[in-house]
UniProtKB/Swiss-Prot annotation:
One of its GO terms (molecular function) is RNA binding. GO terms for biological process: translation. This is Small ribosomal subunit protein uS9. Belongs to the universal ribosomal protein uS9 family. Residues 111-130 are annotated as: Disordered. It comes from Xylella fastidiosa (strain Temecula1 / ATCC 700964). Keywords: Ribonucleoprotein, Ribosomal protein. The gene is rpsI. InterPro entries: Ribosomal_Su5_D2-typ_SF, Ribosomal_uS9, Ribosomal_uS9_bac/plastid, Ribosomal_uS9_CS, Ribsml_uS5_D2-typ_fold_subgr.
């Protein structure tokens, strides 16, 4: 019997997540480690589970995730988008619900580049009137 799986790619900031959705009992593993071990912060784990909780599929799928680049917040956001896209590939009727919650939208915010002559992207040297 072939393994049927659904795939979704998610990106946020400089992070990328490849999500593979398979029928199962609710195991989520990120880079070969369980979700609770990979993300130390509860908020990151909550972000990852949001699309599953919204569609009431928490214990219906086993999810295999490969996350690269960026930090924990970026990776959590990328995984959330990837899971949402994989769920839509599995069942298209979930799309309006996920879109309404904002899980289908790629967050376009990126780090602004540092400019020449400034300390950071916008931070300039202190201005002295006299």
């Amino acid at each position: 019997m072939p393994i049927t799986q659904n795939y979704g790619t998610g990106r946020r900031k400089s992070s990328t997540a490849r999500v593979f959705l398979r029928k199962g009992s609710g195991n989520i593993s990120v880079n070969g480690r369980p979700l609770d071990e990979f993300f130390g912060r509860e908020t990151a784990r909550m972000i990852v589970r949001q699309p599953l909780e919204l569609t009431k599929n928490v214990s219906n799928f086993d999810i295999l995730i490969t996350a690269t680049g960026g930090g924990t917040t970026g990776q959590a956001g990328a995984i959330r988008l990837g899971i949402a896209r994989a769920l839509v590939e599995y069942d298209t009727s979930l799309k309006p619900e996920l879109r309404k919650a904002g899980f289908m939208t790629r967050d376009p915010r990126e780090v602004e580049r540092k400019k020449v002559g400034l300390h950071k992207a916008r931070r300039a040297t202190q201005f002295s009137k006299r």
